Amino acid sequence: YPLYLKYSTKVVAHTIKSYSKFTIPYPYPVAQSLEAANGMEYPMICFNFGRTEKDGTYSEATKNGMIGVVIHEVGHNFFPMIINSDERQWTWMDEGLNSYCEYLTEELWDNKFPVSKGPAYKIVDYMKLPKDQLEPIMTNSENIIQFGPNAYSKPATGLNILRETIMGRELFDYAFKEYARRWAFKHPTPADLFRTMEDASGEDLDWFWRGWFYNTDPCDISLDTVRWAALNTDSESFGTKERMFSLPVAKPILNNFDDVSKQRNRKDKNIVFATDADTSLRDFYWHYARGLAKVDTSATEIIIPANTDTLSREEKQSIAGNKYFYELTFSNKGGLVMPLIVEWTFKDGTKEIDRVAAQIWRKNESKVVKTFVKNKEMASIKLDPMRETADIDEKNNTWNVETEPSKFQLFKNRTRGPRGASNGANPMQKEIATYIK
């Protein structure tokens, strides 16, 4: 068992160190990993797959699968052994949270480790499925059709989106550690997780729980239109001519209807109005409202003098600079609210990213318009350039259409072998020179 001799114990130690960093210190005296045909967890002991070929070589998929399953099964000591949720009722609180911490641990193992759960783009194919093939994460575990994505991948992805895109690493990590601390050796429900994350972070995340956990809507934000304008510092006078208009005399400000309270207050002999008790409070408008003040009702003539542009080109640039104004219109076609992540590519080849919080959708969840002010002329715009939001349709994310791989190319990119198997010949068996350490 060369793979286990080389990696198992070190992966166990790495897992305990990583999970302790993101949750609470490991409280048990031991953690054991045993080689078996598949993965299964118990307190302080787990069984994991990953065997070499008869000649002692192994595929990359076998090695990575073995490392991943050891991390996952050892991680179950934290979820659900220590933070003891009910897996039969809420599988995602066990498998989903553990898959999220597994992802963090794999990322800290090797920056090139081929993770399968966690990154937003990995969940896109699942989110694209027809609605009749999807259930909310909050569905009872016995009724889940797509068990793997629903209980493992989607919850892990949601937490990663919160950490990387919505809350930020520092705030999310603090809140998640607080959840683990508060609910260690207790029996939390989903509400306890949601409440603790909000309470510890001070963030209102209702919109995210509702969209990601209680709904099946995908993220599909489109960039519909781009309008832009630049300050013209070379124009001559843009002044106005002298204008005159009539301003009528303002009428008394009165309610257009005496409601029941006003009528009853007048009839109530026990009520004495302040302006009756102290007549010094009665000013001109008290009398005017009652028709007791005589005024000249003829309109007043107002003259607005001509206004001319007296600024030079240099003065205009000094005041406003060389600015470009871009008005972008976005549509929420998928239904799931997400932050707007806008990447600008300017004509000089430089790039810049703006991040707009999801709260921009609070008044209209279907369409929003946002204006950006830039110092350079834009060449192209792209939404979600790092694929953080699990957007299911990237074709409507750009201004200046970009090419997309054909379906055949996408299929080739997604092809992978079965669990623990490679999708090609074993390169370890074909080594002809010793690799450089």
Task: Explain the meaning of each model-derived region.
Residues Y1-N77, M81-T91, L97-C101, T105-D110, ...:
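Juxtacatalytic substrate-recognition/specificity segment
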Residues N38, E95-M167, W183-A184, F213:
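Acidic/His/Gly-enriched intrinsically disordered linker/tail segments
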